[in-house]
Amino acid sequence: MSDQFEVSGTNTAALFTMKLHRGDGMALVAMNWKKGKPPQDFVGFAIEYKEPNGDKFFALKNRLAFAGMDGSVNPNQLSTRLSPIQKFRWVHFPRNAELAGDFTYTVTPVFMNAKDELSYGEPQQAAIQLRRETYPGKLNVTFTRGFVSSQAFVDKYGADAIPKLLPANADGGLDFVPTLPNAQDALAWMGFEARSAILEVLDQAIADKNARVRLVVYDFNLPELLSRLKQLKGRLKMIIDDSGTHKPKTSAETQAFDQLNTLLGAANIKRQHMGNLQHNKMIVVDGPKAQAAVVGSTNHSWRGFYVQNNNAIILRGKSPVKICMQAFDDYQAHDDVAGFSKTTSANWNDLGLGGIDARIDFSPRSAKNAVLKTIGDDVGKTTSSLFFSLAFLYQTPGPMQDAIKKLQADDQIFSYGISDHPVKGLDVAKPNGKVVLVSPKELSKNLPQPFKAEPTGGGGVRMHHKFVVIDFDKPTARVYMGSFNFSGAADTSNGENLLLMRDRRIAVSYMIEAVRIFDHYEFRIVQADAKQAKKTLQLKKPPRKPAEKAWFEEDYVNARKIRDRELFS
């Protein structure tokens, strides 16, 4: 029914509003009460959905339940018609999100009387198209799952699955074979759409016998990628980073180089680190049938695909392929900052995607065409909301940190942010509730019933995104993303890709990704603090005593939660 990226329910008889936001592989369902606060007997929302061309609705399930008669914790996940969602928004991952057509959502308010009996109010319903590609045939935003530290992973594969799914160290990655019986199912779940889309591009390149293929990689230790590249003999050229731990003969990157050098010939593969790192993650396919370019933050490694929060954008068509091919040629011709920064690749280039305002440029740049300050200035022009997920923000002082810290003082700006480490000067929770930052955490202590201990995913970075979403809810919405760390080194020393997209559909997708990560880790940060941690997590029944408060009370008195409730619905 609708190709819109935001759709609202239209039932005027319902006591609440409902708005659907399209994400990539997910949907954000947001609600708000129309007049004042809900009644005290309101205990949450039941959410159900129907797939395109389906004939039945499926209720979302809730891990939390009401306490039993004796106060016991129910360990079972129940339908939200029995265990309603006690939040004003929810990010849903449909089982078959790639299906074409309308996904129909029905949201129903749930009430509880003095006998603990449930009843249901007038529902809201709306339909939205999720489908696989953000802009079919032009641009696709993709994400990894990034949630090995989650209850969903533990439920599906067990808390001890990681050693059976991932190599103990990066250098052994090329020879590692998972031993978990359902490993392929697990890897597909962990890698999510980013993994499937990247592998699809390489498979299309293999099938198109006249396609030329170019890769620039940083981390590289995935056998499923190496085996595909070996099928591209005579058509593949490649650049592999040789900085730091990538340089020794024992590194996976050197092992891959040695194998491919023998196959491709020295003229077609090289090592490089520019001024510091060749930090790109770029694939380009130029053929009669397949024309695609892959950019973003997703490293071609076990951790990049299966542990970290990452994103990749798949660009389709002659124009983006030509631009990215030129960037490869410029990297191949210049190992130095001075040489590369003079090329057209080190400036903004319109991707020519027809109806999508999207530009790309590549690092390293000179001081004259550096972009970090202008990005910081643009962040400073935020008028409504800022969402960011920035790895290494804690160790990159400069325009980006300065701009975000300045926004903390502005009560009119709503912001959620994620970094891989806490950032000095950016608070996890501000008294005014407007700007909040979280970092990755797993449930390993202070476990609340009915939750189980979660794996860490091994040592190293878990949150690896590099994106900023400015004013997603305005016509001026824009997204910066890429391999670019929003640091001085990324700007003028490293090899990097950076995109600027002024497009609301894309901005909404990245906003939802930021929200789902923020929610995931905010709860875990609270539980890690013994003073704040809850021993049990259960749904709240209506207030029965004068001192008791309804579950939604905070959503109407906490400044951040008020803004959250109003912004998304």
What are these regions (language model features)?
Residues 170-192, 348-366:
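Acidic/glycine-enriched edge-of-secondary-structure segments
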Residues 335-378, 382:
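A charged, amphipathic alpha-helical module
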